[in-house]
Amino acid sequence: MIVKLNFDSEIPIYVQLRNQIVVSIGKGDLKQGEKLPTVRQLAEDLGINTMTVNKSYGILKSEGFISIDRRHGAKINSTLTPGIDFKEKLDDELSLVISEVGLKGIEKKEFMDMCEKIFSTMKGIKA
């Protein structure tokens, strides 16, 4: 698993890690059922604190992207289903993104084309 963290970013490391794992699942780089590195191993590989990785894994688990078993470690969930909470979160986040897009002068067609292009690169999602 290739993870690139920006230590100068205002985005916390645990959020960057969480986001990169989600995108890797979406792109198909991480497959459903695939094991993730242990917290210790990933922390060592990235040069970060184990608590940072643990926090990312905890968020991913609570969001349903991964499951964690004491004996077998963390793995990508084989069934990913959206809940009502996720749809509400998505609505809020899309409202913000669309507002920013419009305020920055990007036309709807250009935005939709960008979305289509990105969506087409996501080999790990069932569409």
Q: Which residue stretches match the model-derived regions?
A:
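A short alpha-helical element within helix-turn-helix/winged-helix DNA-binding domains
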Residues: 35-46, 60
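Key DNA-contact positions within bacterial/archaeal DNA-binding proteins
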Residues: 51
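Interdomain hinge/lid region at the active-site interface
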Residues: 95
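Beta-hairpin "wing" of winged helix-turn-helix
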Residues: 29-30, 34, 61-71, 77-78
